[in-house]
């Protein structure tokens, strides 16, 4: 009976075991995903970083000091790379572009730095006795410049002949000097017609530009350091703000000429197809409208006067340069623009403005007032700062059919009368003014108008008025730079990517470290590809970052060499150094992370970190075949730091395991077992074995006592010893005999340490054999509990189904009753409304009937 019970129990065990094995097989069938690290993925994020410059400075005159200090820039790349990003859409915003702010700060810094070694004109802040310069001619050159009267002579009072007392080379001696100054540069003292002072003496420190300084704009290319990239929008009608579908990546921008001008944008880039107007908000009249022309309009400017300049000593080692005299007729500086070309340009601008302002009448008017830099078109021409009246350009009205009415003449050219100003309030900053020394001889310059800066008049009734008035604007040089940088943005390269795969790091091995970088132009070309396609080209994508850093170092050394005679770095040299340090920092940071994760020198690195479905529950096929790396990075962006920390913890644990494995290598050779240095280990092992045996004997002694107590008696000894045979002089008695048997002794059959071990092991096996019923009882209890538990679960499940059905029926009945009640109430309300409506409709009829009865 007992054997049959055991067989029945084992049959139940077999069923439960089969079920458990099936569950394990089902669980193991769902394949686990693991985190895999990829280095060189085409992922970027918006960033602000220090840009450096590239320029062809050697192509320009080296005798003069260029204010832009482009000799400190790196040479431009003769074959610039531009990689088109297929299937990539990126957001741009020209109005919130750090490149604009950076260029503005750079240009101001360059101007300030170029003026540092120059002469301060503080001694000239004295009383000037000025009289109007008479329009006389020099007898030797009386016919030199009388060929054209249409250019106009200078108005009376526009130039002053001023005399003043100045300190000579000897400080305690004064002498009287004279200079020809423009009216715009002096201001009357106490409304006196003869006493004047320089215009900025009471507010600014006037610095004279050094004699050999040049303001000629040289194209400057802004470049991103290694680890960063510049994205370029190639949409031909891009408004400057919003998404761009035609995106490419470049290392440097195009050559941007830092032309400091107002109202008209000169010598910039052109729109490719149509005229484009850009504004941060067209409905806000406080926002400047930047007009980007598709065809340039040439403007030719001249100062016909042949000026002679002289040098006045104003102290030891300091000289003031001023106009000595003017040879020939003193004529007005002016600029000429083709009337037909300008009118055609305005027509195209008007058509674009009407698209924004609902076909209203467009009126162009002159500036409403302000500083001379804003009221007039200010720019530098051949070293002189011209201030031209642009009212002939902005004096027209355009009706709905793009016809216009102007009040100017019908000559072929539009002539702008210009004034020259020598004291310049730089960048509209308080406390900074520059004196531009006069240029000898005649001055001629030709520029291309490539854009306009417009402002729109506001008012309360602009919505009802059919006219929009636009005026030339400017003054904030950021708009000048923004007109060229509108299509660029700086991004930082994030070459490290993590994604789930089926591969797991199986073994711990020591990897050889290698220096591998990321070519930000090359691998961004795969940005529009799926993750699977991009991961195939990781080797190509991860090559030239380190070489880019080395090239940056060479560029920096070349820049320092070019400026070693100055013993100081310009803003460009500092930016070169910052860019290199930043590139090295980025590279070392990425390599440090790879080292923390045990992935140094690897492009694809498997790990032992399991992928958590809460990070992303997308399938592998959906991830690798349908998503780009940029999309995937946005998907897991919130969990990146967590994944990085898990990778670091996993690698730390793996290194500990590796250390333990390496510590076991010293046992690989059998001869090392007999090394004297290992004897201490042998002693420790022996002590542990002896301690274990003693502990085992104590345990079995306790178990034996418990067993004997359970049987109802306690032995006198823990081991039964066989009787010790008596000697020949003391023979043993027989059964019937009495005697002193209490004095007999017994001993073990075998003595020694091994005998103790044998006895203990034998007792262990006997104990296990005698208590096998305990296991069967426990198994039976577990089986009964499982069966009862299963029956209880089934009962609860049936009960739950019953009550859920009852609740469902009750809910349906309640909803039906509610619907019926609502329907009946709705019908009553509708009926009441209908009766009320009929009563109202019948009121005229009732009134008519009442009147008829009254009349009858």
UniProtKB/Swiss-Prot annotation:
Region (V3) spans which residues? 301-334
Motif Di-leucine internalization motif — list its residue ranges: 855-856
Q: Hey, which stretches end up on the Extracellular side?
A: 32-685
**Statement: the UniProt record of this protein carries the keyword Disulfide bond:** yes
Q: Where is motif YXXL motif found?
A: 713-716
For the region Fusion peptide, give the residue spans. 514-533
Pfam families given for it? GP120 (PF00516), GP41 (PF00517)
Instruction: Name the source's superkingdom.
Output: Viruses
Region (CD4-binding loop) residue ranges read: 367-377
**By what name is this protein known?**
Envelope glycoprotein gp160
Gene that encodes the chain: env
């Amino acid at each position: 009976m007992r054997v049959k019970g055991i067989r029945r129990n084992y049959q139940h065990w077999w069923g439960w075991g089969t079920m458990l094995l099936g569950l394990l097989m089902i669980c193991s069938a769902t394949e686990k995903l693991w985190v895999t690290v990829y280095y060189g993925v085409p992922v970027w994020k918006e960033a602000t970083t220090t840009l450096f410059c590239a320029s062809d400075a050697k192509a320009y005159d080296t005798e003069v000091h260029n204010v832009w200090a482009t000799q400190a820039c790196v040479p431009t790349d003769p074959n610039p790379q531009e990689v088109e990003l297929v299937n990539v859409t990126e957001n741009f915003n020209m109005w919130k572009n750090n490149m604009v702010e950076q260029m503005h700060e750079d240009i101001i810094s360059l101007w300030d730095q170029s003026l540092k070694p120059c002469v301060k004109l503080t001694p000239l802040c004295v009383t000037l006795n000025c009289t109007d310069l008479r329009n006389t001619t020099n007898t030797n050159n009386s016919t030199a410049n009388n060929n054209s009267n249409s250019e106009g002579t200078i108005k009376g009072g526009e130039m002053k002949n001023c005399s003043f007392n100045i300190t000579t080379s000897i400080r305690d001696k004064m002498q009287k000097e004279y200079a020809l100054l423009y009216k715009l540069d002096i201001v009357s003292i106490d409304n006196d017609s003869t006493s004047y002072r320089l215009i900025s003496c009471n507010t600014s420190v006037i610095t004279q530009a050094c004699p050999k300084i040049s303001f000629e704009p040289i194209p400057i290319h802004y470049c991103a350091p290694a680890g960063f990239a510049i994205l370029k929008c190639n949409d031909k009608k891009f408004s400057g703000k919003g998404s761009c579908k035609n995106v490419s990546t470049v290392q440097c921008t195009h050559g941007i000429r830092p032309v400091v001008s107002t109202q008209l944008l000169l010598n910039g880039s052109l729109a490719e197809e149509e005229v484009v107007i850009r504004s941060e908000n067209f409905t806000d009249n406080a926002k400047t409208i930047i007009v980007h022309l598709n065809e340039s309009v040439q403007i030719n400017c001249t100062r016909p006067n042949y000026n002679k300049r002289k040098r006045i000593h104003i102290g030891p080692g300091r000289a003031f340069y001023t106009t000595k005299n003017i040879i020939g007729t003193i004529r007005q500086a002016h600029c000429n623009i083709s009337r037909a070309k300008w009118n055609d340009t305005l027509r195209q601008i008007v058509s674009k403005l009407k698209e924004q302002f609902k076909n209203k009448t467009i009126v162009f008017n002159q500036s409403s007032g302000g500083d001379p830099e804003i009221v007039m078109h200010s720019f530098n021409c051949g070293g002189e700062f011209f201030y031209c009246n642009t009212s002939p350009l902005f004096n027209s009205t355009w009706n709905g059919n793009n016809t216009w009415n102007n009040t100017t003449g019908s000559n072929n050219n539009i002539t702008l009368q210009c004034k020259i100003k020598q004291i310049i309030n730089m960048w509209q900053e308080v406390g900074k003014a520059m004196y531009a020394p006069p240029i000898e001889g005649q001055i001629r310059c030709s520029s291309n108008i490539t854009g306009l800066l417009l402002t729109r008049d506001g008012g309360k009734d602009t919505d009802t008025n059919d006219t929009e008035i636009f005026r030339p604007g400017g003054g904030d040089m950021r708009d000048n730079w923004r007109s060229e940088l509108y299509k660029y943005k700086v991004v930082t390269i994030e070459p490290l990517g993590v994604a789930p795969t089926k591969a797991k790091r199986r073994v711990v091995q020591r990897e050889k470290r290698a220096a591998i970088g990321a070519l930000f132009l090359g691998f961004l070309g795969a940005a529009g590809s799926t993750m699977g396609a991009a991961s195939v080209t990781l080797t190509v994508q991860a090559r030239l970052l380190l070489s880019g850093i080395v090239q940056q170092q060479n560029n920096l050394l070349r820049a320092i060499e070019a400026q070693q005679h100055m013993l100081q770095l310009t803003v460009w040299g500092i930016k070169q150094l910052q860019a290199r340090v930043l590139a090295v920092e980025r590279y070392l940071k990425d390599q440090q992370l790879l080292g923390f994760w045990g992935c140094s020198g690897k492009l694809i690195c498997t790990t032992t970190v399991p992928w958590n479905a809460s990070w992303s529950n997308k399938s592998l096929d959906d991830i690798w075949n349908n998503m780009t790396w940029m999309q995937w990075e946005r998907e897991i962006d919130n969990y990146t730091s967590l994944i990085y920390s898990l990778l670091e913890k996993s690698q730390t644990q793996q290194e500990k395991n590796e250390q333990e494995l390496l510590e076991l290598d010293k046992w690989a050779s059998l001869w090392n077992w007999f090394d004297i240095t290992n004897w201490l280990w042998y002693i420790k092992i022996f002590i542990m074995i002896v301690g274990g045996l003693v502990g085992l004997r104590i345990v079995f002694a306790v178990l034996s006592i418990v067993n004997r107590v359970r049987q109802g008696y306690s032995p006198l000894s823990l081991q039964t010893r066989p009787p010790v045979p008596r000697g020949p002089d003391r023979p043993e008695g027989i059964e019937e005999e009495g005697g002193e048997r209490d004095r007999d002794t017994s001993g073990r059959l075998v003595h020694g340490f091994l005998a103790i071990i044998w006895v203990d092991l034998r007792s262990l096996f006997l104990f296990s054999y005698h208590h096998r019923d305990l296991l069967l009882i426990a198994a039976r209890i577990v089986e009964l509990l499982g069966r009862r538990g299963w029956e209880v679960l089934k009962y609860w499940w049936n009960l739950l189904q019953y009550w859920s059905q009852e609740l469902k029926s009750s809910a349906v009945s309640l909803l039906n009753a509610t619907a019926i009640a609502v329907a009946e109430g709705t019908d009553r309300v509708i009926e009441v409304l209908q009766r009320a409506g009929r009563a109202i409709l019948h009121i005229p009829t009732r009134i008519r009937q009442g009147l008829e009865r009254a009349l009858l």
